[in-house]
Amino acid sequence: MKKALRYIDAHLSDELRLEDVAAHVYLSPYYFSKLFKKYQGIGFNAWVNRQRMASAKEMLCHSDWSIASIARNLGFSQTSYFCKVFRQTYQVTPQVFRLQNNANYDGD
């Protein structure tokens, strides 16, 4: 599983498909999916989105990239979908998160 997780982390900006990661670790997609959920506690797509959202938070805090650029850099073809996933994950839009975060840094 570690090899699969390293592959996912190295390819967050790519279109990550379960089938491709399974092939990378020489497992069938079905078996890989079952093992992944067993060991990670969540499904493959949820894990990928969780990793991407963690990276998005870092980029929003520590870069001046546009939200669209961050979305593209994390493998999202549509900025609107990126914003939707971010909001579902953190209950705030990327723009509001960035504004709140910058306000916190300005006060230090």
Language-model regions: role of each:
Residues 3-6, 10-19, 38-80, 99-108:
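Terminal helix-turn-helix DNA-binding modules in bacterial transcription factors
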Residues 22-23, 36:
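Short linear motifs at secondary-structure transitions and domain/linker junctions
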Residues 24, 73-74, 89:
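Residues within the alpha-helical elements of helix-turn-helix
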Residues 25-29:
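Histidine/lysine/aspartate-rich catalytic loop segments that bind and position anionic ligands
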Residues 31-32, 36, 81-82, 86:
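Short hydrophobic/aromatic patch on the recognition helix
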